[in-house]
Design a protein with these regions (language model features):
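Core catalytic lobe of class I
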Residues: 1-162
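S-adenosyl-L-methionine
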Residues: 165-177
Length: 177
């Protein structure tokens, strides 16, 4: 809460194993959940155990501080434009991360760039700072850089930080052209 600006927002992605307790924790910490977005994966990993339905979705919570004067940014028109002129709904359908986005190394929960593109473009403007305290392979940083946002990434795994650094170095070189 301390580093989030009054109009800033927080996005958290999770599976059924954790997202509900995260939602409760957000509310206990006086955050207001703006949206509960379902990412419907068009190519989920197979259900090898065959003891439940195939896990084909993840939930993304979008929240802000629950303060009367806190007005968050939502780039409604841009989201509508990205969705073929129609209102964007809270179910986002798309594939898992493409192999071309994993060239720098593998991360078990790497998100596809199109997913972070929607998140970043929906709730930030050029020059804004995007913080990812679990940056993993750096997808948030890559997309932030592509769209003129500043990025701060944190992770506790050196191997994943190396992957993120390689990806961020490549985007930085491309942007300097």
């Amino acid at each position: 809460r301390r580093v989030l600006k009054p109009g800033g927002t927080i996005w958290i992605s999770g599976t059924l194993h954790s997202i509900y307790s995260i939602g409760v924790a957000l509310q206990q910490e006086l955050y207001k959940i703006i949206n509960n977005i379902t990412w419907k994966k068009t190519n989920p990993p197979p259900n090898l155990a065959c003891r439940c339905f195939t896990h084909s979705t993840e939930t993304i919570l979008w929240a802000r501080k629950d303060e009367k004067k806190a007005r968050h940014l939502f780039n409604y028109e841009q989201m509508k434009q990205m969705n073929g002129g129609k209102q964007m709904k809270d179910v986002w359908e798309g594939s898992l991360t493409r192999p071309s986005e994993k060239w720098a190394g593998r991360h078990p929960t790497q998100k596809p760039e199109y997913l972070l593109e929607r998140i970043i473009l929906a709730s930030t403007k050029k020059g804004d700072v995007v913080l990812d305290p679990f940056c993993g392979s750096g997808t948030t940083g890559v997309v932030s850089g592509k769209y003129g946002r500043q990025f701060i990434g944190i992770d506790n795994n050196e191997e994943y930080l190396d992957i993120a650094k390689r990806r961020l170095d490549q985007i930085q070189e491309a942007l300097e052209w």
